[in-house]
């Protein structure tokens, strides 16, 4: 009887660990679009889902999934987003270390650090990317295309080009205190 109890507890622990790892990531669907492919027999319908995945602690990714049903497309988008994760260096006040720009297709995104208490001032897919990356104080401006996918990719590129103060100091061969 005691062995059965131990087995149940250990399986519960295993299940808890699994759900903890899964719940660490947040997923937000930015867009679901019905797309068609013209084939010999007519038109074939499918769905495209743009999904942003992040842990709100400096990791974020954008994924695209296509399937004949919405749930399958979202599932594929989540898997794709987890494959294309980017690490974002965050400052103590949950902002970014310096201004940055990124391009994705015809979309261009400018992001700038903001003072504590400012919040995320951005729109559309860019806002979702920044929130799921864990950035709490930032200003962003979207230029060019209004496509959610290109804007999300541009925001991801801008975040991936960020460097920490330590990296900059190391590349210049100076102490970190000299940067401030």
From Swiss-Prot:
Keywords from the named record: Ribonucleoprotein, Ribosomal protein, RNA-binding, rRNA-binding
GO-annotated cellular components: small ribosomal subunit
GO MF entry, a single one: structural constituent of ribosome
Entry annotated with the keyword Ribosomal protein: yes
One GO biological process term: translation
Bias-annotated ranges (Basic and acidic residues): 17-26
Subunit structure: Part of the 30S ribosomal subunit. Contacts proteins S4 and S8.
This protein's name: Small ribosomal subunit protein uS5
């Amino acid at each position: 009887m005691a062995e059965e109890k131990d087995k149940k507890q250990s399986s519960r622990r295993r299940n808890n660990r699994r759900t903890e790892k899964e719940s660490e990531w947040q997923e937000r669907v930015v867009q679901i679009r019905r797309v068609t492919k013209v084939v010999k027999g007519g038109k074939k319908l499918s769905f495209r889902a743009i999904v942003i995945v992040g842990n709100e602690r400096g990791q974020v990714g954008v994924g695209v999934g296509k399937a004949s049903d919405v749930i399958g497309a979202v599932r594929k988008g989540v898997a794709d987003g987890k494959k294309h994760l980017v690490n974002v260096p965050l400052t103590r006040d949950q902002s970014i270390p310096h201004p940055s720009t990124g391009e994705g297709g015809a979309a261009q995104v400018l992001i700038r650090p903001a003072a504590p208490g400012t919040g995320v001032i951005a729109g559309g897919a860019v806002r979702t990317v920044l929130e799921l990356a864990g950035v709490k104080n930032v200003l962003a401006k979207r230029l060019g295309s209004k496509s959610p996918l290109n804007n999300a990719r541009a925001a991801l590129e801008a975040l991936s080009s960020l460097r920490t103060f330590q990296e900059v100091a190391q590349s210049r061969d100076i102490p970190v205190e000299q940067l401030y």
